[in-house]
Amino acid sequence: MNLSLTLMTDVALALLLVMIAFWLPQLNIYTEKYSSYECGFDPMGSARLPFSMKFFLVAITFLLFDLEIALLLPLPWASQTTNLKLMLTMALLLISILAAGLAYEWSQKGLEWEE
């Protein structure tokens, strides 16, 4: 009985919401509102636009560092291990690799946005 009452209430509520949606006035449809958004590029324009290689390199660098930072997320759970010295050594090694990668990227002027 309880399940059937719940189902009938859900169906009645859904039908009520559908009827209200049909009675509400339709909003103006703008063509720009319904066109696809492609990261600031015109989707109906030419697909052969020049692409900024600097933007691509910064995006790839962000993805690499983001994935490496995700490797640090299990550290609080890893700190409960019995071999704490090995865990801390591995965490320090990972952070050192991240710092070395950041220093290399900085020295190669990969983080500067100048044309």
From Swiss-Prot:
Reactions that this protein is recorded to catalyse: a ubiquinone + NADH + 5 H(+)(in) = a ubiquinol + NAD(+) + 4 H(+)(out)
Gene3D superfamilies named among the record's database cross-references: NADH:ubiquinone/plastoquinone oxidoreductase, chain 3
Q: Where in the cell is it found?
A: Mitochondrion inner membrane
* UniProt GO molecular function: NADH dehydrogenase (ubiquinone) activity
GO-annotated biological processes: mitochondrial electron transport, NADH to ubiquinone
What family is it from? Belongs to the complex I subunit 3 family.
What protein name is recorded for this chain?
A: NADH-ubiquinone oxidoreductase chain 3
Tell me which species this is from.
Avahi cleesei (Cleese's woolly lemur)
